[in-house]
C-alpha cells in the first residue's frame, strides 16, 4: 500500500513486472479488492486504487464530481513518475 504525498489517496502496486503498467479502476460502491482474482493473469505491473470515498481513500470534500475522480487518477500517475 502506498499513500500519495499530495493527496489522501491510497493505491497498491501489485504483480510487479518490467512491462508497461496497467491501471485498474473499480466502480462505485466497490474497492480495489474487486480486482484480486484477475491480478495474476497479467504479465504486467498492476496498479489498483480506491476511488474517492471508497475503501481506504477518504472523501476530500462533501461533494465530489467526475472531475475529482479524474484528478485523483492523474495525481496517482504523477506519484509514480
What do these predicted ranges mean?
Residues 1-3, 27, 61, 65:
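Pocket-edge positions in alpha/beta enzyme catalytic cores
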Residues 4-16:
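A short loop-to-beta-strand scaffold at the N-terminal edge of the catalytic core in hydrolase folds
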Residues 11, 34-37, 41, 68-75:
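Alpha-helical elements of Rossmann-like donor-binding domains used by nucleotide-donor carbohydrate transfer enzymes
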Residues 14-58:
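Conserved HGGG/HGGXW glycine-rich cap/lid loop of the alpha/beta-hydrolase fold
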Residues 47, 51-81:
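Active-site loop/oxyanion-hole signature of alpha/beta-hydrolase fold enzymes
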Amino acid at each position: 500500500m502506498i499513500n500519495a504525498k499530495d493527496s489522501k489517496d491510497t493505491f497498491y502496486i501489485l504483480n510487479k513486472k518490467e512491462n508497461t503498467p496497467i491501471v485498474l479502476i473499480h466502480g462505485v460502491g466497490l474497492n480495489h479488492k474487486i480486482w484480486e482474482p484477475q491480478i495474476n493473469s497479467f504479465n504486467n505491473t498492476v496498479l489498483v486504487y480506491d476511488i474517492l470515498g471508497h475503501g481506504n481513500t477518504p472523501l476530500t470534500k462533501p461533494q465530489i464530481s467526475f472531475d475529482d475522480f479524474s484528478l485523483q487518477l492523474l495525481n496517482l500517475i504523477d506519484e509514480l513518475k
